């Protein structure tokens, strides 16, 4: 059998319902009339939301509710082997770019299911700030997961540099005035806690300390560079345009068995400065 899932190629506004068009056929051309389609719907954040602007991160990384399951799908195709699946809006209060993902299987009695996946982009505003860290990656060991991963790292004795754009979903760089940029230090006071059920566990108390704030202007067809001195510790860079926030990925820094914080770039991006 063949299964086709179609959605709108253009990002949809955050207040819209989303429709997927489904078509199933047998390999000899006959429609898969009455066959069952089963699957799942997922909501995921789209940090790299603009393909035309590689390296720029969009969306509030601290925003809750952007990564969750929206339930199961169980429908039957009509006599023409077609169906239309409309997903009612459950994300209109979110401010980050999103992907609505449909993963579905077309079932056949006595045969193997055919599984396909479709992704619909959701864009929460006409334009959003985007942030690109201007420093390289380093392989970092995370003792909690006992694994290494590449993460952006601010070198010792260097500034944390970022490019900021104001762009729409097509990657057009627009002009923006009075974008508010804040550098927040994420203080973590670690301590050990013991319980009979969990034994000894490493925990921390969190406190955010604002270290810098400035207002910037971003030109049309361009970007604005911002630089901040950072000491040992964990940070995030926040960019606010009206009520919309933009965030980059989460960054951490570990070295020789101890955690070395970095700066968390974009609206909530962590980076850790290299103290070695």
Residue ranges and their predicted role:
Residues 1-276:
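A structural signal for beta-strand and strand-to-loop patches characteristic of beta-rich domains
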